[in-house]
A protein has these predicted regions:
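Short helix-boundary/capping micro-motifs
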Residues: 10-28
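A short LG(V/I)-centered, amphipathic sequence patch enriched
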Residues: 40-57
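Alpha-helical linker/hinge and terminal dimerization helices associated
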Residues: 42-43, 64-86, 93
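Central regulatory/effector-binding core of bacterial HTH transcription factors
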Residues: 89-153
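Secondary-structure junction motif
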Residues: 102-108, 147, 151, 183, ...
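Hydrophobic hinge/microswitch elements
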Residues: 135-139, 145, 204-261
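Flexible hinge/capping segments at coil-to-helix
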Residues: 157-173, 177-199
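Beta-alpha-beta core module
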Residues: 159-166, 171-172, 232-281
Length: 299
């Protein structure tokens, strides 16, 4: 197995065709096909399913692709270090639920390591996709929460994907509401007081199970429900409709605006917010620095 073969596999997967990949790599189609066949034979797996309609990644191939990306990234780091090219393009990706502290830490990371060239990604996405991203090594770190309700299901899923959960902090439930909301004068809010107001949550796509929800108490029956995909829309609706969402209570006025406040909710439950990593992965210097930045905003 060679780094060149790994580059071939990744390029074919990204382009979706041997023809386009060969053009992009400046190699002949037969040479590219033979190189991939040799790799499949050596690894004793089928990376691509081949049909009359083209090629698609197999399940084994999808897993292999994640490891291949990590190997190439580590090889690039070695080249940067020992070929005297410290200014090479750095790559890093985090997948997270919608937390302002995750964004703030990402900003700090870029300020510290953002050179002339870098390729960083911050994916605010659905819970299942966070798990998939880290499992397939697309992201080095994933940020989500566990509680008594979802822990059994999510812990089983994490284990089956060779992932580990590392707790960052424990939060008591709060509600995000508009500063002009009728309940904004309260020092604490009950679920009963919220019954008449629209409840906003982040949709979870095809995995729209209570267990994958970003919001605690997702299994509660509510009269008015609105699901959204992004933070800006959720906050606009909170303000425009006197809606609310249930959260950790960690708020940043620069990101969330001065019109949104967090008020404690009367409930004894808690949210154990943390990050997930791959058991077989190695935390990079960028990953370690990002986690240090997280602690700054949580401490």
């Amino acid at each position: 197995m060679t780094l060149q073969q790994l580059k071939y596999v990744i390029t074919v997967a990204e382009t979706g065709t041997i023809t386009e990949a060969a053009n992009k790599l400046y190699v002949s189609q037969p040479s590219l096909t033979n190189a991939i066949h040799e790799l499949e034979k050596e690894m004793n797996i089928v990376i691509f399913n081949r049909t009359n309609k083209g090629i698609t990644l197999s399940k084994e191939g999808d897993d292999f692709l994640g490891y291949a990306r990590q190997v190439l990234e580590q090889a690039a780091i070695l080249e940067d270090k020992y070929k005297g090219n410290p200014g090479g393009k750095k790559q890093f990706c985090v997948s997270t639920q919608h937390y302002s502290f995750a964004v703030n830490a990402f900003v700090d990371l870029i300020k510290q390591y953002g050179q002339e060239e870098y390729d960083f990604s911050l994916r605010e996405t659905q819970t299942y996709e966070i798990i998939e991203d880290v499992a397939r090594l697309r992201s080095e770190i994933g940020i989500l929460f566990l509680n008594d309700f979802n822990q059994t299901v999510l812990s089983k899923l994490l284990k089956s994907h060779d992932l580990e959960f590392h707790q960052l902090f424990v939060a008591r439930p709060h509600v995000f509401i508009s500063r002009k909301h009728p309940l904004a004068v309260n020092s604490i809010i009950t679920n009963e007081e919220l019954e008449e107001y629209p409840y906003l949550s982040f949709e979870q796509g095809e995995h729209n199970s209570f267990y994958f929800s970003e919001e605690i108490f997702s299994d509660f029956e509510r009269k008015k429900n609105i699901r959204v995909r992004d933070r800006a829309t959720l906050f606009n609706l909170l303000i425009g409709l006197n809606g609310y969402t249930v959260c950790s209570g960690v708020i940043d006025k620069k990101l969330n605006g001065k019109d949104i406040i967090a008020v404690p909710l009367t409930d004894e439950s808690d949210m154990r917010i943390g990050y997930i990593t791959h058991r077989k992965g190695m935390l990079s210097r960028l990953g370690s620095t990002y986690l240090e930045a997280l602690q700054k905003y949580l401490g």
